[in-house]
């Protein structure tokens, strides 16, 4: 469970499905407002370390955004206290002026003062909607980028001499799926297929840098080698080269 303060009046609490289960809740509980849900919200607020701006009394509104694997709860603090204090409404006239006002005039003045106080709440809600929209766009972009990420990479290395190729093969200790050896235009080309799915994002670049200490990186694609090159070893080329000498 994570909490993020978006503004002075808004918090975002993110809970995983496991967080909900641990507290006896499920996503369906948020679909229909009920006393259990409200009690759960306030229990979460007690559990978390609240910012000072949320510690004073005031009405809190809760907005729930369910996701497939989590729930985002936006907590907005109203600037109108639950127990409205006329002293907080600075636009109200003093007692002498109140005595001269008709009931209709008093109600209109009171409504104006409250409207001014709730302006910040409306702006907070609008800001919250913008934050939600941006976060949804960011999450969608991250999901699309993740879906486009290839779990495998073919590295293609070029060697001028067979001896250099064999020497490189003997340095290989990283895991690979397979490797191929081609010859084209009097040069040797080694393709190495590596599974990067369970590795951190910098791993492919780190691995290439390590390979380039012993070999030249090639711009020639594997499809070109397959079409125009001579296949010397169609699989496990590195393992076979390691056996030489």
Swiss-Prot record:
The N-terminal domain probably binds unfolded/aggregated proteins; the C-terminal domain interacts with ClpC. Belongs to the MecA family. Coiled coil: none annotated. InterPro entries: MecA_C_sf, Neg-reg_MecA. One of its GO terms (molecular function) is protein-macromolecule adaptor activity. Homodimer. It holds the Pfam family MecA. NCBIfam families: PRK02315.1-4 (NF002643). This is Adapter protein MecA. Enables the recognition and targeting of unfolded and aggregated proteins to the ClpC protease or to other proteins involved in proteolysis. Gene3D superfamilies: 3.30.70.1950.
């Amino acid at each position: 469970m994570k909490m993020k303060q978006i503004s002075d009046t808004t918090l975002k609490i993110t809970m995983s499905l496991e967080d909900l289960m641990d507290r006896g809740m499920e996503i369906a509980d948020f679909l229909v407002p009920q006393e259990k849900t409200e009690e759960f919200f306030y229990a979460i607020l007690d559990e978390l370390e609240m910012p000072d701006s949320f510690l004073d009394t005031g009405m809190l509104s809760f907005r729930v955004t369910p996701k497939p694997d989590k729930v985002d709860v936006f907590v907005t603090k109203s600037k109108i206290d639950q127990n409205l204090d006329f002293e907080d409404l600075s636009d109200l006239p003093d007692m002498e002026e109140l005595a001269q006002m008709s009931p209709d005039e008093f109600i209109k003045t009171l409504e104006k003062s409250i409207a001014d106080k709730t302006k910040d709440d409306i702006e907070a809600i609008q800001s919250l909607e913008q934050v939600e929209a941006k976060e949804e766009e960011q999450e969608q972009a991250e999901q699309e980028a993740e879906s486009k990420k290839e779990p495998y990479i073919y590295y293609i290395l070029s060697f001028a001499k067979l001896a250099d190729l064999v020497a490189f093969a003997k340095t290989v200790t990283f895991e690979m799926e397979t490797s191929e050896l081609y010859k084209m235009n009097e040069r040797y080309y080694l393709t190495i297929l590596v599974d990067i799915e369970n590795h951190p994002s910098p791993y492919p670049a780190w691995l290439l840098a390590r390979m380039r200490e012993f070999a030249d990186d090639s711009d020639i694609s594997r499809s070109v080698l397959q079409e125009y090159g001579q296949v010397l070893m169609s699989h496990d080329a590195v393992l076979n080269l390691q056996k030489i000498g």
